[in-house]
Amino acid sequence: MNFVVIFGPVAVGKMTVGQELEKITDLKLFHNHMTIEVILPYFDMKSPSFKKLVTEFRIKMFEEVAKSDLAGLIFTYVWQLDSSSDCDFINTIVNIFERAKATVCYVELEASTEERLKRNISPNRLQYKPSKNDFDASEKELLEIDRKHILNSDKGEFRNKNHLKINNTELNAERVAEIIKERFSL
């Protein structure tokens, strides 16, 4: 089994790359907003109930997938590398898969802010992430998260791990998925 964690800044293309990777592998996509959009109509994103439900739902999903006969899972996440709670969450989910003897692959995407602002309003993104339909709020959130957090690693930070960092500013999602598939033999 393979567990592919695709991470990077807001609107870098994680879900779209995950969709393309799902098409060319036997892996299933579980993108970040699959849980967010289900719970958001009931609880504000900043509320303790929202955070608890999203986290618990994801953990249960990962536990079930890890003990299943699925080939693996692709998970997308805006990992705030300077956030201890985000790092703890990633460690928790990675441990679930490592205990199941899965191969964990880290795929880090980076792209220019200008390109990400364009992607932030792409039809594919808006189709699967209705909470992003308020363009002004979504753009403000993108820029604010960029300002407040570290969203891409420094060179060498992921030594000793299956890690691939791709600048996809000028690469389409299909090509990025091919690179990932080749690099990790998926």
Residue ranges and their predicted role:
Residues 122-175:
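Small-molecule kinase domains that catalyze NTP-dependent phosphoryl transfer to phosphate-bearing small molecules
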Residues 6:
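Hydrophobic anchor at the beta1->P-loop junction of P-loop NTPases
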Residues 98-120, 166:
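Conserved phosphate-donor/acceptor-positioning beta-strand/loop module used by diverse small-molecule
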Residues 9:
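P-loop (Walker A) phosphate-binding loop of NTP-binding proteins
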Residues 19-63:
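Conserved substrate/cofactor phosphate-moiety recognition/catalytic segment
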Residues 58, 62, 173-181:
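Short, amphipathic alpha-helical "lid/cap" segments that border enzyme active or binding sites
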Residues 53-106:
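Glycine-rich phosphate-binding loop used to anchor ATP phosphates in small-molecule kinases
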Residues 14:
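Conserved lysine of the Walker
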